[in-house]
């Protein structure tokens, strides 16, 4: 997207914690309009945006999607493991191509405290 910087919440930049590092298994993409679309833009872009989003769902790239109740813009749970792929998917959508949508990307992975339930051998931890 031209002149629109996406915000990235990168887990590698977060404070250290006592749990093992886990892989990124999904990415949450939180969209927000960069400016209100005009009625003309809505008529032109939205008939393309919905099928393009549905295509990504049918290709398995979008797992789930929602709309926020307090702001405009979609929230997508993406079945991708890299920020680069997530960004490319969102930028290819018509609203992204028009520069009307920016995204915050959050890398997600397995719940790390679950490691406390395992010993080094992968079994039960009797010290809990």
Residue ranges and their predicted role:
Residues 2-128:
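Conserved, structured core segments of small domains
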């Amino acid at each position: 997207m031209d002149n629109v910087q996406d915000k990235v919440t990168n887990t590698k930049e977060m404070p250290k914690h006592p749990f093992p590092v886990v892989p990124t298994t999904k990415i949450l993409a939180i969209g927000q309009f960069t400016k209100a679309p005009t009625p003309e833009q809505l008529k032109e872009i939205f008939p393309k945006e919905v099928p393009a989003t549905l295509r990504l769902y049918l290709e398995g790239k979008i797992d789930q999607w929602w709309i926020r109740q307090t702001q405009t813009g979609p929230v997508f749970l993406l079945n991708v493991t890299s920020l680069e792929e997530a960004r490319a998917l969102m930028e290819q959508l018509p609203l992204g191509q028009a520069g009307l949508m920016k995204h915050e990307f959050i890398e997600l992975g397995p719940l790390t405290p679950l490691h406390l339930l395992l010993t080094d051998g992968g079994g039960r931890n009797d010290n809990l």
